[in-house]
Amino acid sequence: IAFALAMAAFAAVGLSGRYPLVVVVKEMFTGLDSFPLLAVPFFILAAEIMSTGAISRMLLRFASQFVGHLRGGLGYANVLTGTLFAGISGSALASAAGPGAMMARMMERSGYSKAYAGALTISVAVIDPIIPPSITMIIYALQDRNTSVGSLFMAGILPGILIAALLAAVNWWISRKRNYRSLEPRPPVGQMVRNSFAALPALLLIVLIG
């Protein structure tokens, strides 16, 4: 699509004869000459590295110790892990392919229906473009010079948390209706402290990147 649009624009300018082609090239580079735009490829790279590394497992272990003992605990862990990962990646695809895919497989093995596991995982991934850092918000801010990237980031925090809370409420209702069990008993306090320290690098990334 991008190449088709570019070729159509070049053809229109060339046939009209009103502007030299060098103006089109200059405008293309001017549109990309933006410091905030540099964050987009690095966010994508960070999300890909984190989705294939140990950070997803750290966040999963950290989230499960708080909600895994509840009825439908894997669903809650899916929501909480995805929300935490949203503060790192900013990419819905990275969330669905990384911690989302891991959680969906665990839910299926634990007796959750494949349809529900997939639906919940995809719904949680939608939070990523809302909670900062958000690639979508950066691109939107570049189109309007009166819009601040920081203001958009601040505006996305509360809606993202509300969506996560609503997904947790849906999981509560479906888990009671379908009698989904808890993931595991609540771990001892010492184990929770060790898990929290192990997840500290991932949690610090949320603060640094956000």
Over which residues does each language-model region extend?
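Alpha-helical transmembrane segments of multi-pass membrane transport proteins
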Residues: 1-210
